[in-house]
Amino acid sequence: IEASKIGLKESLSFKKDFSQITDAEIILTTQFCFDAHKVVDWSNNLLKSGIDLPIHIGVAGPTKLTTLLKYSIDCGVGPSIKILENNYSNVGKLLTSYSPSKFLDDLSSKTLANPNNNIQKVHFYPFGGIKELLNTYN
């Protein structure tokens, strides 16, 4: 969500126009996110600027916090690391597991409160493994 703004609006406008001209189904798919408020604000700002493409929000599945931090660094999800630091501020908490439940609850309530948004689905990054993800959300 914190992507460079240079050319971003033009790129998204091109994708929207392309989808209308070609009838191609274009979906905006995000990296894994941690802040539902920022996600919904971003989605609303897109709508205000005329970008009404459907959005699928990336969600980090249940995993060890150290694994999640590794993927965050590897994927360049810098601002998201700050959120993790704020929620897991001491070293002892680094040994715990991460669950996306709070993020999903917040995202749910924010999107249900504003049904005129373009967030359609979430997709999971199974950093803790497919089995763990399915056991948690099956």
Q: Which role does the model predict for each range below?
A:
Residues 24, 80-84, 136:
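Generic hydrophobic, helix-prone segments enriched in Leu/Val/Ile
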Residues 14-29:
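Conserved thiamine diphosphate
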Residues 3-6, 32-47, 129-133:
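Active-site-adjacent beta->alpha loops and helix N-cap segments on the catalytic face
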Residues 42-56, 135-138:
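Alpha-helix-loop-beta-strand connector modules within alpha/beta enzyme cores
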Residues 26-35, 58, 123-125:
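Catalytic beta/alpha-barrel core
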Residues 1-17, 48-112, 128:
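Active-site pocket-lining/capping segments in soluble small-molecule metabolic enzymes
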Residues 115-117, 121-138:
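C-terminal/domain-terminus segments
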Residues 23-26, 51-55, 118-120:
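Short, well-ordered coil/turn segments that N-cap beta-strands
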